[in-house]
């Protein structure tokens, strides 16, 4: 979930088509192939020399993703785009109407959300260990830049 909140998008195109996309540097394309393999659907494409994407467009697999994400989103901005996505999905599909769960999840130290989000936002989050001055005292920190 955290990885998607960092680098994923729920897209409604100007034509009304639905698409779920996770974007990564082509250097990390193996992550996208791993997601494709674990889910058993979607496709990975290269977009230019530096960017690759994992894409899901078919309605039946979008329905599965909606079930996974519904009620499991942390950020209000991602939840808003998800709700718009689900609203369009309900209009387009023959699946039972999906009622969105209007609560935000709070990540804990005991789940993998922080790891996924930090990995996705590799330039905005990191773990550090440093020695303080000339002593043997060290400090561990988790740094995360603000999310817009």
Feature annotation, model-predicted:
Residues 1-148:
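Internal intein/HINT superfamily modules and their associated LAGLIDADG
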């Amino acid at each position: 979930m955290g990885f998607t909140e960092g680098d994923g998008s729920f897209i409604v195109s100007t034509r009304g088509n639905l698409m779920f996309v996770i974007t990564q540097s082509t250097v990390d394309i193996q992550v996208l192939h791993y997601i494709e393999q674990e889910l058993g659907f979607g496709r990975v494409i290269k977009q230019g020399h530096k960017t690759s994407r994992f894409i899901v467009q078919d309605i039946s697999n979008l329905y599965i993703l909606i079930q996974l994400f519904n009620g499991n989103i942390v950020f209000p901005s991602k939840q808003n785009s998800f709700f718009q996505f689900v609203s369009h999905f309900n209009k387009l599909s023959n699946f039972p109407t999906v009622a969105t769960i209007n609560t935000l999840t709070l990540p804990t130290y005991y789940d993998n959300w922080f790891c996924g989000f930090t990995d996705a936002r590799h330039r905005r989050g990191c773990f550090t260990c440093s020695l303080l001055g000339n002593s043997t005292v060290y400090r561990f920190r988790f740094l995360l830049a603000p999310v817009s």
